[in-house]
C-alpha cells in the first residue's frame, strides 16, 4: 500500500515538473518583469545616497608615555565601544545640528551615521550617508569634530588623532542596482513558480488515461482521437 502511495506521489511530482517546464517561458517572463521593476525602482524611484567616511585613533588615557602593550590594545578596544556611544550621543548630534544649521531632529541625523570599530584596533570609523555628496562629507567631518571634543571632555583623553578626513564620494553607495535587479529576478521566478505549483496541485481535471483509471476505477480500452485534428 505504501509503495503504491509513494508511486503516486512520484508520478504527481513528475507531472508537476512537466507542467512547470512547459511554463518555463512564463516563469522567465515574470522573473524578467520583476527584475525590470527592480531596475526601474533603483534608477527612478529611490533617491541615491552618498557615504563619506572619516577615521580617528584614540590612545588609552592610562597608557604612560604613549607606550602601547597588548594589554593596552585590548583595553583600548573596550574603550572604543564607549567612544562609539559618545559619538552617537544626543549632545554630539545636537552640536552638529546647530553648527550645520540642519532643519531635522537628532533622531534623523542618527539614522545617517554609522560608527564602526576596526577589529583589534582603536581605530574608529565614522560614516555619514546623505543624498548630497558634499553634505555627507561635511557632516562626517562635523560629527568627527564634535565627537572628538566630547570624548576629550568625558574621558580626559587628549591624544586623539584624525587618521582620515571625510572624503568626497564620487559615486552613490546606495541603492545597489545589481542587487535589486537580482532580488527582483529571484522573487519573480519564485512567486510565479509557487503560483503554478499551487494551481497544479489544485487542478483536479482529468487529463490522462491514468487520471481516468484513478478517478473512475476503470481500465482504458483505447483512445478516441480528436477528429478536428485529423
Curated annotation (Swiss-Prot):
Gene Ontology terms, MF aspect: protein tyrosine kinase activity
Q: In which pathway does it act?
A: Capsule biogenesis; capsule polysaccharide biosynthesis
Which cellular component terms (GO) are annotated to the entry? Answer: plasma membrane
Q: Give TM segment ranges.
A: 25-45, 181-201
Pfam families in alphabetical order: Wzz
Sorted alphabetically, which keywords does the UniProt record give? Answer: Capsule biogenesis/degradation, Cell membrane, Exopolysaccharide synthesis, Membrane, Transmembrane, Transmembrane helix
Keyword Transmembrane helix set for record: yes
Q: Which processes are annotated in GO (biological process)?
A: capsule polysaccharide biosynthetic process
Q: How does it sit in the membrane?
A: Multi-pass membrane protein
Location of this chain's protein in the cell: Cell membrane
Family, similarity comment: Belongs to the CpsC/CapA family.
What does it do? Required for CpsD phosphorylation. Involved in the regulation of capsular polysaccharide biosynthesis. May be part of a complex that directs the coordinated polymerization and export to the cell surface of the capsular polysaccharide.
The protein's name in its UniProt record: Capsular polysaccharide biosynthesis protein CpsC
Q: To which species is this protein native?
A: Streptococcus agalactiae serotype III (strain NEM316)
Protein's gene: cpsC
Amino acid at each position: 500500500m505504501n509503495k503504491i502511495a509513494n508511486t503516486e506521489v512520484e508520478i504527481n511530482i513528475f507531472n508537476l515538473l512537466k507542467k512547470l517546464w512547459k511554463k518555463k517561458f512564463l516563469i522567465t517572463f515574470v522573473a524578467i518583469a520583476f527584475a525590470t521593476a527592480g531596475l526601474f525602482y533603483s534608477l527612478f524611484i529611490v533617491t541615491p545616497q552618498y557615504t563619506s567616511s572619516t577615521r580617528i585613533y584614540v590612545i588609552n588615557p592610562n597608557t604612560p608615555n604613549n607606550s602601547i602593550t597588548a594589554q593596552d590594545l585590548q583595553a583600548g578596544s573596550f574603550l572604543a565601544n564607549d567612544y562609539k556611544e559618545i559619538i552617537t550621543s544626543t549632545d554630539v548630534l545636537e552640536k552638529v545640528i546647530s553648527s550645520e544649521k540642519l532643519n531635522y531632529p537628532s533622531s534623523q541625523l542618527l539614522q545617517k551615521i554609522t560608527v564602526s570599530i576596526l577589529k583589534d584596533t582603536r581605530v574608529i570609523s565614522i560614516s555619514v550617508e546623505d543624498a548630497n555628496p558634499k553634505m555627507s562629507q561635511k557632516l562626517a567631518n562635523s560629527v568627527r569634530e564634535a565627537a572628538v571634543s566630547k570624548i576629550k571632555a568625558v574621558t580626559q583623553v587628549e591624544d586623539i588623532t584624525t587618521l582620515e578626513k571625510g572624503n568626497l564620494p564620487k559615486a552613490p553607495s546606495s541603492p545597489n542596482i545589481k542587487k535589486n535587479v537580482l532580488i527582483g529576478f529571484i522573487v519573480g521566478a519564485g512567486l510565479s513558480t509557487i503560483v503554478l505549483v499551487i494551481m497544479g496541485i489544485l487542478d483536479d481535471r482529468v487529463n490522462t488515461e491514468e487520471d481516468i483509471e484513478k478517478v473512475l476505477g476503470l481500465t482504458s480500452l483505447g483512445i478516441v482521437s480528436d477528429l478536428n485534428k485529423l
